[in-house]
Design a protein with these regions (language model features):
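Histidine-dependent nucleotide/RNA phosphoesterase domain, centered on the 2H-phosphoesterase fold
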Residues: 1-175
Length: 175
């Protein structure tokens, strides 16, 4: 049986480092075996990896880097996430969902709310305290999406299956 696939946004190094540091500080260490990530699709069929890879190469070839804005914090009950907005990311995800619609699972058919989790599996009190601390100094900031990363789910850890960088030029040819 093939392993399910996960698709995430590849962020610029500065943003990735910022979220990773927060995750290292606030995620329970025994559960923190992944870097911070923004998941676009949670469970793609592993037996379609070749076709998915082809689609990602095609879509990323015509996609300029994306600007996302961290607009606030979201309570996860037992954790905290940064909420992000980007019309371009929403459009890209819609296009991929259109291509892969027949085999998307229930979680990937739900509404897409981009976020990066920096704490999870904590007590509700610990999560509430962290959210209040982060909220006290929060101001919106930009994150650059530079590509997409495909992963194989290994019952906990993830194994890299491919990285697809966005084009450095807009798809309409303008610079």
């Amino acid at each position: 049986m093939t392993r399910p696939l996960i698709l995430t946004l590849k962020m610029d190094d500065r943003s990735q480092g910022r979220f990773d540091r927060l995750r290292e500080l606030h995620f329970p260490p025994e559960r923190n075996y992944l870097n911070a990530h923004l998941t676009l699709f949670h469970k793609l069929p592993g037996d379609r990896e070749t076709g998915i890879s082809t689609d990602l190469q095609e879509v990323c070839r015509d996609q300029a880097p994306l600007t996302l804005t961290a607009t606030g914090l979201r309570s996860l009950g037992r954790g905290v996430a940064f909420e992000l907005t980007s019309p371009g990311l929403m459009s890209l995800r819609r296009e991929l969902a259109r291509r892969w619609g027949p085999w998307l699972g229930p979680q990937d058919r739900q509404g897409f709310k981009p976020h990066v989790t920096v704490q999870n599996k904590a007590s509700p009190e610990t999560a509430r305290t962290l959210r209040e601390q982060l909220q006290a100094t929060f101001s919106p900031f930009e994150v650059e999406g530079v590509g997409l990363s495909l992963w194989r789910y290994l019952d906990g850890p993830w194994e890299p299956a491919g990285t697809y960088l966005f084009s450095e030029r807009p798809k309409d040819g303008r610079t």
